[in-house]
């Protein structure tokens, strides 16, 4: 074992704790490690996932036994849930850290960050490069607006300047993919002014493209996806349109649009395709 390495794995909750433990054993075996430093209960996205985890004789009781045996260090949870459920899970006081989504283009989990900080929890940001806007393949407009930094560097530094955030997840298909993130880390102490300038530039570009009246009101009074005919996720569709209009984030918007209707509780609701068949505009 490498003392400089912190090893994390994720196991989803299960209605049958014995199945949860089997998956935990499988993960441990594949990692070929004597101890898991961090275990995340993966995907507390719905109230029933939380219940499976924390109820008496639930999945967390298995974890506590493993912790007592010295096989697991800290336990957290990962989530794509709405912010109220994230906060409810945080405030159980049963978890040491949380893996969630929060980055420049998506900050609606701000209240969850506040709750995690108040409960002295670690915060791990999920996929800030990919889910933060396909920053590995940025638009020319985004590249220009983020200059002299690359959009990946800007987003990394935007997140890490917030003292409530401790870790960013980084995917790499080749070792060189890590270089730009290491470059961002090397600039943490010198780029505060640049980050502020880029942030203002991005916001100004969005106001220029969309207008102040739209940007200050677009998300007010919108129905939830499960309150809408065809389960169309109107808030997400409008958000994606904002990203497209403001910063030319076409590849990301298309990817997220295509996932709606196929993402289940990880990315709930449907896109607007059903307007062409089963749902009328009058509905």
Locate each region found by the language model:
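Short internal beta-strands
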Residues: 7-9
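Secondary-structure boundary/capping positions in well-ordered alpha/beta enzyme cores
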Residues: 2-3, 34, 96, 166
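Structured C-terminal cap/extension of enzyme domains
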Residues: 111-283
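N-terminal binding-site loop/beta-alpha segment at the start of enzyme catalytic domains
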Residues: 1-5, 283
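Glycine/proline-rich, positively charged
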Residues: 13-111, 117-125, 129, 147
